[in-house]
Amino acid sequence: MHLRHFFAFLALVLCHHTHAGNPWKLSLTDPKEKVTLTIDLHEESIEVPEMEMFGPMNGYLGGNIYGVWAVTSFKIKKDKAILRLSNDLGSETQEAELTQTSDSTYTLKLLGSTVVKRAEGRKLHKITSTLKMIRNQD
């Protein structure tokens, strides 16, 4: 009987440790730019707003930007993830590098020419190419 309790406790601890040490399943916000990034790079588990018909995906970039940008592919390299984002029309893509800088902060750097934009008045303007992201509380 005690052995069964031990293994149940061990499974619970390992499960918690896996989620606590998982830097690639999270929700981030840049409070200054009001941009959010929600990702799960371990499985396609996130419903992307306005793209529900495609089923769960690995994540999206949204908030104070024009449209929603879905994570269409990614590569994890040590402490960085290279994300490929596609807009909700499928007409533009943006590569971005996500780097963990501390337990609760990340930097999202848009690579190449920035195509992610925000509407200001009647015009579209490119967002800043480097976003300081803070991990949202689960």
Where on the chain are the PLM-derived regions?
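Bacterial Sec-dependent N-terminal signal peptides
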Residues: 1-24
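Central antiparallel beta-sheet cores of small beta-barrel/beta-sandwich binding domains
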Residues: 21-101, 109-138
